[in-house]
Amino acid sequence: MVVGFWWLERHAFQDSYESDSGTAQTIVFPEAYIPSFEGGELIIHDHFQLSYAEQYEQAAWVAYTLDKAHLTGDIRKRPYYIMDPMVSTGSADWRNFKGSGYDRGHLCPAGDRKFSETAYNQTFYTSNISPQDRQFNAGIWNELEQQVRRWARKYGKLYIITGGVLGDGLPTIGTDYVAVPEAYYQVVIRGEGEETRAIGFLIPNTNTDLQPEAFLISLDDLEALTGLDFFPELPEQAQ
């Protein structure tokens, strides 16, 4: 009985993946590149940040920095999905996804945060997941994540903003009515100042045999679709 209770206390009662010491090194995302989203709650974790949209029970955007030094490939024990303790209204419960037919799709990929246990575990907050078609998640979305990692190894530091396209009338899952996006976007930026370059993708939340480059989109068009203002200080020629 003692062993059983210890297991429950350690696992079932886990309510935070924040650093106990408070000394974890924070990976900074440039403030100038943070998109605007009216009504979202800004949440800043050690290794990514997001704007939580309570009406859709998920992030409107997740932003993170990716450097080739982050791609360590360390083996990490997969933690439980838990609610984000920093979301004041409470992020969606992971059980909303049970029996829904949708994957718990990461926005900031767990595979990009294996360089530390805290970084890896924080990606399992439910504020960082969104309902994704299983073939989409395992297929083209994974291919895009792999491509971004190749770019990070080639070019060094990248800044990524990603999320589902949210809006009225979307289907929902679970008792929290988690919205199911019809498409997901990703914006990748490298360089700073006049050397800044950005590329955008918009991919339907369904299976496809096409490659990510088939879904390139300008930032202007992506802003019109999402209602977000990406990189407000980014030079126009970079977009």
Predicted regions span which residues?
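Domain-level detector for secreted/extracellular nuclease and nuclease-toxin modules, and
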Residues: 1-239
